Regions:
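Cleaved targeting-peptide boundary
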Residues: 32-40
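Secretory targeting signals
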Residues: 1-6
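Small/flexible residues
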Residues: 7-10, 37-38
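Ser/Thr/Asn(+Pro)-rich, low-complexity disordered segments
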Residues: 39-474
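N-terminal export signals
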Residues: 10-33
Length: 474
């Protein structure tokens, strides 16, 4: 939740709704936004990734691993301290310096929090019995007391009683993030009640209700206006949605749902990839749980696609160094976050929002498995160079601007969550290894047509490097 009560997905939904209502504006905006990044003219021809994902795990240095441990552990502190002890609902945002009086939770932050509890239990950061009890409290409350529509949950709610907050929608993607957290717990904890509750929550979700004769999944529903007009019909963080729906043992959707969403082809500096008019997080979220390494469907190798998209994002940031000289090889990364003027869904390419030289740590934190060496350099720089201004009780502040000396006062649950989960995946593959043990997850990916990447499908080629003029600037 933001200072003006709008989330990243709500911002994108509103933008999508505006463009859907005003086609001429959509065309004009597309032309204005793309500048050097261009949408390829044949959207039906899906790009075959030329850089197959590498199964070799990056080896972090001891110094890097110590920092990652610190990042993860402090991020976990958010999910432990800013969750209601009885309901388990995790606060949407909180002061970076410590507890505050806000009481609005987000169901997505709660899903990240459930997964964080698995990681903390495995790494010994908190009493294991207390962790198990917190997981049980969360799943019990969600199943027995949290209001729902056909198994789908409010985006935002009061963390003490679960009642709807801010007139928010019943959100398909945020419920999916919660269900991913629940299924991670089911796979990790050897506890009959946890496994039963997580399974029931997943089985309760009626995916057919979200489709209702359409080819794609609805973004959400409100009692005032029914289903939102915008749908999950183009590449974004959506992949977890159809995969969970395909694997459902109770309300499955047909395999056609996987092919129904568009996969637009983008090109930047002669590098092609599947992209979106959206910030960098769309290339991260589904990858936090689903292991797309070394597998592909008939369209693409999505893990490699995220590597390319992240590489392109870095190049784009460095090309902005003439305007924002703090952007270097050691400091880059923008995604939806706080800004001095409220919450902004910014990033690129193509440019979204009023880029002003800000840095968003979860942009690189959430990209750790894709570019471990290069993202670690950024995280180390922020920790060492900007100190207590950019690093507080729960780790990195949500965003900061070294050019204007502005620092966000808050931490967002989903931003701390994506950093924590992807850091652990980059270090050990822990979340992937456990989440993928769920048979429904395997069935979903099988129904979507995923198979191992074959040598004949890959034609390796170096991804172009870019060095900014300010690369070594101190």
């Amino acid at each position: 939740m933001t200072q003006n009560r709008i989330s990243r997905r709500q911002w994108l939904k509103q933008a999508a709704g505006f463009l859907a209502l005003v086609p001429a504006a959509s065309a004009t905006l597309e032309a204005a936004l793309f500048r050097r990044g261009a949408l390829l003219t044949d959207p039906q021809k899906t790009y075959l990734n030329l850089f197959p994902s590498d199964p070799t795990k990056y080896r972090f240095t001891l110094e890097q691993d110590v920092l990652l441990e610190e990042i993860e552990r402090t991020s976990f502190g958010y999910f432990w301290e800013q969750a209601h002890p009885d309901t388990g609902l995790v606060k949407d945002r909180n002061l970076a310096s410590g507890p505050d009086e806000r009481n609005v939770a987000s169901i997505a932050a709660t899903g990240f929090g459930l997964t964080a509890l698995c990681i903390a239990h495995q790494r010994g950061w908190q009493d294991p019995l207390q962790i198990v009890q917190r997981v049980k409290n969360t799943l019990r409350f969600a199943f027995t007391r949290l209001p729902h529509q056909h198994g789908f949950l409010w985006h935002f709610m009061n963390m003490g009683n679960g009642q709807r907050a801010f007139q928010s929608e019943v959100s398909s993607i945020d419920t999916a993030i919660f269900l991913c957290g629940a299924l991670a717990c089911r796979a990790y904890f050897d506890d009959a009640e946890i496994q039963d509750l997580a399974g029931r929550l997943y089985q309760r979700a009626d995916w057919n209700w979200l489709v209702r004769g359409e080819k794609t999944i609805a973004m959400g529903w409100t009692p005032e206006n029914g289903f939102l007009r915008t749908r999950w019909d183009s590449y974004s963080e959506l992949m977890m949605l159809p995969l969970l729906a395909l694997g459902s043992p109770t309300h499955p959707l047909p395999p056609e749902i996987w092919d129904a969403w568009a996969r637009p082809n983008f090109e930047f500096d002669n590098i092609r990839y599947i992209g979106a008019h959206a910030p960098l997080f769309v290339h991260q979220y589904s990858h936090a749980w689903f292991d797309f390494r070394n597998v592909r469907d008939r369209h693409a190798d999505y893990f490699t696609n995220s590597i390319i998209a992240t590489k392109v994002h870095k190049i784009w940031c460095l090309e902005l160094a003439s305007q924002f000289p703090d952007y270097t090889d050691d400091l880059w990364g923008i995604t939806a976050s706080d800004s001095p003027h409220g919450y902004v869904a910014w990033g690129g390419p193509p440019q979204m929002g009023p880029i002003d030289g800000s840095v968003v740590p979860c942009a690189t934190g959430g990209s750790l498995p894709f570019m471990p060496e290069e993202t670690m350099r950024v995280l180390q720089t922020v920790r060492e160079k900007y100190g207590a201004r950019a690093w507080q009780r729960y780790g990195y502040v949500d965003a900061f601007n070294p050019l204007t000396n502005w620092y966000s006062q808050d931490v967002l649950g989903i931003d701390a969550g994506i950093t924590l989960l992807m850091a652990e995946n980059a270090r050990s593959g822990f979340v992937w290894d456990h989440f993928m043990k769920n048979p429904e997850v395997q069935h979903g990916m099988s129904h979507a047509g995923f198979h191992a990447v074959e040598a004949s499908e890959a034609h390796p080629r170096p991804i172009p490097e870019f060095k900014s003029a300010a690369t070594n600037r101190n």
